[in-house]
Amino acid sequence: MDNIFVPSNIYMVRTPIFSIELYNQFLKSDNIDYDLILQNDIFKESIMTTTYNLYQSIGKIDWEKDNKKTRNVKESLLKYLIRMSTRSTPYGMLSGVALGEFSENNNIKIKDSSFHKKDVKIDGQWLYKLVHYLESDYTYYKDSFVIWNQQNYIYNNRLYLDNNSSITENKRNDVLSVKYNSILVFIHENSKKNITYEELVQLISSKYSIENKEEVKVFVQELINKEIIFSDLRPTLENKNPLDYIINSLNPKNSLVGTLINISNEITKYSKMPLGKGEYKYLDIVNLMSQLFVSKNYLQIDTYIDYSRNELKQSLADNISEAAYILWLLSPNHFGTKTIRNYHEFFMDKYGFEQLVNLKQLLSDINGFGYPKKDSYSFSNNIAFLKEKYLLAIQNNSHIEITENDVKNLEKNNTVSKINAPVSTEIYSEIYFGNSIKGYEDFAVISPILGSFNAGATFGRFTGNFNIKKKNQLQKEIVHHYNNYMNENGLEISQLNEGPLNSRNVNILNNNRIYNTCLNLNLPKSDIDINDIFIGATFNKLYLYSEKHDSRIVFVSNSMFNYEFGSELYKFLREISFEKTKFIQPITEEGIDSLPFCPRIIYKNIILKPATWKINSEMFSETENWLNRFATIREKWHIPKDVIIAFGDNRLLLNLLNDKHLIILKKELKKHGRIRILESFINESNNERMLEIVTPLYKKTSLKEQSFIIPKNRNKHFNNLKDWFSIHLSIPKTYQDNFIQDYLLPFITELKVNNFINKFFYIKFKEDEDFIKLRLLREDEDYSQIYSFIKNWKDYCLLNSELYDYSIVDYVPEVYRYGGPHVIEDIENFFMYDSLLSINIIQSEFKIPKEFIVAISIDFLLDYLEINKSEKEEILINNAEDLYRSNDIREYKNLLAKLTNPKNDYEILKKEFPNLHEFLFNKISILENLKKTLQKSLYTSRSRIIGSFIHMRCNRIFGINPEKEKFVLSIFNEITKTKKYWDGCD
């Protein structure tokens, strides 16, 4: 196995506060003594700090009664007890975390809960209520610094803002638009000088001779309310004690400061209390905080587990990293997100390779594309050998085992470059001790939620209170690895933070600063300015460029925040940053996933996927006893007695012989319509407690990505260009070729014959729908002369063809993409030549597939333009990701070499394919002129321009079809290689 990942030396262990013994001895019983359990102070405080309403209900319940309210409270407490003894995911005092280290032996000894520590800070919801209050009163923010919101977009003397945080409590969904007047310009300029709000009010009053400063304060407050400006009273997400930060930022004379200091002191006292001893102190703090602001949540609590030893075998780490590599090989071959891939196509069509576009301009609805439209999609794989193993496992009542030979075959058949594997990642796995798997004394179960996008993300919010030595060791590893990655590729890594749309997400977004720079959206202290960020494109991806650093920039998150819940800008930056990355995903095999049962899938002592059963409400009828029906299902599918039910991100261990547990399952099934049941390993191990570890992994090879030249050009509007008449013709892709032959070509011919136009060209395109872009040019640019003619033709097509819509749009020439304003007219002449050639190829029949005809035409074009060998190689590098289907090309290689031999004006081509020969030489003077044009000084390299010609020719003939285009380039590559050794002459 050529494993590309190496594990960290450090892991995070996550474990529930109680041991498995609680579940086994008490929670399987039908008669749980809740009075006895509630005498446990840790349990009581845990309930209070996570679900206060449930805590309040406890004192009002008569446990002897059997009414609905009592049953509901008992059920809720049971679920909490199960979670606190069997689920490791950190949450309040229910479970906690610690750092461990891989070594020679397994040795985990968790201390008694009295040694564990709490880390307590104010909850994000209450925090942002406080910040909103402070930013709403000049008295509090007058001494703070003025911060201009870098997301403000200024265009045509107007200011636009399309993102706002939850601090303002502004539910605005539409784009803010205000006039960018002289006062806003003045504020913008002065905000760069680190001035306070008090100084700003004075400056505005003096500049505009406003005697009444209260008027200025009201105006400034309106700007804050709209988040055009804000203050540095906002704590950054890397601040470990946001309340103390605010206290230290305020004038100590403010009356509120004393109250905040009191709350802070009480929180400190509460943090130092042993678990289970802080019930009344917590209530006192909540009372103090609620007197200021009422909130659903007041405090965020994380628990740190103390231990005497925390070590696991290095061999376990190595096998986990191998399992991650196998999962990567088995993951669907999709890169990044489909949303960004679609956006890349739009970008390429308008801007091409050879210019950078300012980020805010590109995302503007006013003069850019706006944000990408979300595309719902799901991916699964068709893995033949898994299907075979599935059938054998079912037949033999066993599991699916992936062997070393299977891995070798996966590697052999892998078509994705290791360059596209994640630079780093994290894998979540439950750890069990015991010899359940032959030959091993331990085993790991990969979590259904595999891990994170990058090493350190899961650790982010916790790192402030970890073991210092281990924490520093981990951060040193991450920084070293990413420094290597940055140096290999000449790029900058920056940490991305955001004041979120939902204030509760602050708790997840809190993190630790690792990288040299950060971009803080809606927050102060940002090292990166959005105005400095540009977007560029290669043939297969978009990338971000920092003008300040003169390099590509990649944004990473050091938290487990789901970027889907971020602002549109946050999502866009994250999605582009992992564009062209194939991530590790859970095993999804389209054939097996559709079945109600999947056996365990295992590699060595790593369970890649536990045995899984799918239950849905349609399996039950109202006339049949539910418990009897479930018993039948359980017997039929051999579902064990102890299982984990999974619904969404939630998981709960249940015993299927216990009626109370079955009631929980029944309710969840009714609520969600379907649930998954996973096998549990609680009875197959000798664990004293549930253990889950987070293992950071680093890619040890293939860090160097394909290099490319970042263009110097910045997108701008050019004057004095020809004014073309541009039409979009909406027509389904399957009918476009017929439409071009039967309607478009006769129309163009008539326009030309009557001297209504001088030039034309067309492009096939797809946005929300398929359409054809038609461009027409008159030298006098007076299109009123032909409008009625065009309208009549359009009406005729609407009645008689598959054309169903029509629009007149602006045409913006891709000046940078094709060499500059001084050559664009000659390039547009070539577009007409290429359009005529493409139409002729579309409407003609050939004795070889049209991909080969197009490849021949491309070879002809490059030879005629005298494109040299190195430029041809560059064209292939820039435009073809991986050349393929060589077996399909082999039988034509000799014929292709003959047909592309230029001897005697391509006499062999003329003999074998006379029509194609005629098409290529029709209007050959345009190519003669183009050859001279491409000798000039150009904004863009010749190879890039030719690459765009090739792309557009494939587009005109095949439509948007990357696979056909890739095949055409593969054929062209084979022609080039063959002609190195044989010119096609017998």
UniProtKB/Swiss-Prot annotation:
One of its GO terms (cellular component) is plasma membrane. It holds the Pfam family Lant_dehydr_C. It comes from the Bacteria. It is found in: Cell membrane. The keyword Magnesium does not apply. Involved in the post-translational modification of the lantibiotic epidermin. This is Epidermin biosynthesis protein EpiB. It comes from Staphylococcus epidermidis.
